[in-house]
Amino acid sequence: MPDLPEPYHPLTDDRFRLLVDAVVDYAIYMLDAQGRVASWNSGARRFKGYREEEVLGRHFSCFYTPEDRQAGLPQRALDSAAQCGRFEGEGWRLRKDGTRFWCHVVIDPIRDSAGGLIGFAKVTRDMTEQRAAEQTLKQSEQQFRLLVQSVTDYAIYMLSLIHI
């Protein structure tokens, strides 16, 4: 007689929290409807540098550069997520120690059963190393283009001397 399958146990709040906290390559946290940090995972702690008790209740704009805060980017991101169903972008953010890191950000609205906005889910990934590699590749490509152009210009110059 075959074994009966074990009963399915959906994720409880505790198990879901364990799942989110196990993800260390992404900062996954919730903001309330005003943009204050309402939850914090180990990935956020790892690359932003804040412990949960240091950041809960703080407005998420503290992760933005002064220039982006001055330009109103944090509020525009929340407004876009609330109105369009999602905000996605890349930019510089700040760690607790003040150092900058380049990141990819996704913000999704969280709504209650009546459709009212109750907060936002925010997922951030540190892309600093990838961006540095892209910048190095771009520089290398530019240098190669300049070299090819210089060789081409020199060849044209030499050919023009031969035909004179």
Region spans (language model):
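PAS-family sensory/regulatory domains
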Residues: S42, E54-D68
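PAS-associated C-terminal cap
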Residues: M1-R15, S113-G116, R125-Q142
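Conserved small/polar residues in nucleotide/adenosyl-binding loops
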Residues: I162-I164
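PAS/LOV and related PAS-like sensory modules
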Residues: L11-A33, L137-S160
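PAS-family sensory domains
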Residues: M30-D32, A38-S42, R46, Y64, ...
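Output-coupling edge of small sensory domains
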Residues: W92, D108-S113
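Terminal output helix/cap of sensory domains in signal transduction proteins
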Residues: R15, L56, E67-T99
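Sensory-domain boundary capping and coupling elements
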Residues: V105-I107, T124
